[in-house]
């Protein structure tokens, strides 16, 4: 399920757009996640009180967390599939502390692709979307495998 060099290049080119405003992209991804899948909000004590999109847009904490999420993901994507150490660390915190199910990783992957396409339609066409989808699926599969090692049934 690996990606070709060309696909990785599409992923990293798209990610370059994210890096121009990691916090802004991250905030939009989390807003898309929480509005599209309100059940995911229950995993975030810090954000449970945010009920509307306007409240989410006004939240500096949400923006900071979006920055944290996409910074970590960017570091993983730049490893081009050689992300074992990063995924192990992330899976430990997401399984043991945060209890984030793999399904929620699918939801955020969809949100990432949606936000990138909405913000950068001319730079994130079908080929780039397909490559990003494959890269995020690889990440999710590796997270799921690590969850299994940890005994987490997420």
UniProtKB/Swiss-Prot annotation:
Record domain Globin: where: 2-148
E.C. code: 1.7.-.-, 1.11.1.-
Organism domain of life: Eukaryota
Compartments in which it is found: Cytoplasm, Sarcoplasm
Record Pfam families: Globin (PF00042)
InterPro entries, per the entry: Globin, Globin-like_sf, Myoglobin
Positions annotated to bind O2: 65
GO molecular function: heme binding; metal ion binding; nitrite reductase activity; oxygen binding; oxygen carrier activity; peroxidase activity
Binding site residues for nitrite: 65
Catalytic activity: Fe(III)-heme b-[protein] + nitric oxide + H2O = Fe(II)-heme b-[protein] + nitrite + 2 H(+); H2O2 + AH2 = A + 2 H2O
EC category name: oxidoreductase
Keyword annotations: Cytoplasm, Heme, Iron, Metal-binding, Muscle protein, Oxidoreductase, Oxygen transport, Phosphoprotein, Transport
GO biological process, one term: removal of superoxide radicals
Subunit note: Monomeric.
Role summary: Monomeric heme protein which primary function is to store oxygen and facilitate its diffusion within muscle tissues. Reversibly binds oxygen through a pentacoordinated heme iron and enables its timely and efficient release as needed during periods of heightened demand. Depending on the oxidative conditions of tissues and cells, and in addition to its ability to bind oxygen, it also has a nitrite reductase activity whereby it regulates the production of bioactive nitric oxide.
Protein name, UniProt field: Myoglobin
